[in-house]
């Protein structure tokens, strides 16, 4: 693994900090967790989690719910897309794994949701979408936004097993590799996916980070389905307070 003086922030609307020399594939001394809960009222001042320095790099995972909103009656709207993008912009995320995206769906004006999110942030992101399944004449799947300033060397997608179509997004930058995904609800599919993810990560000689909605938890009976496999190569770097408020054992989003 390459040494670096930079700091990585892991964000799933919960924050932790670690040196780049302590990548997601190994435990590291000096790790400190932010342990801050989810956003209850938009992007307030206390929710910005300022970076400690200009050289800090912030990683993030965020399930978009197709930008339908999480209050009132869920509905697709430009306002919801802009609200979603505002969180990313406020946190100044350098690279973001996003789940539940659509592209070209006839019932959603054939929008390219990931590109719309990127445009709404006003940040110079490279967009990487992984079409995982057919939906209403278009595609749905996960994606990644990565700042071009990180020096993107390569991007690719890897098919994963599942009752629904699943994909892994791989983004290699100058300093590290970032994997973004949304794993299946089927236990065996998640176990098989974890093996594939480990194999992909072992193909690189630099720090590798995995981020996404894993539909799995290290707190579940037996350590979950995917985690006993993933923890052979990865260590949890994000907060584990809980994906949903009031449900501390229901963390399923991780970096």
Indicate where each model-derived feature is located.
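Stable alpha-helical elements in mature extracytoplasmic
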Residues: 77-84, 97, 110-113, 117, ...
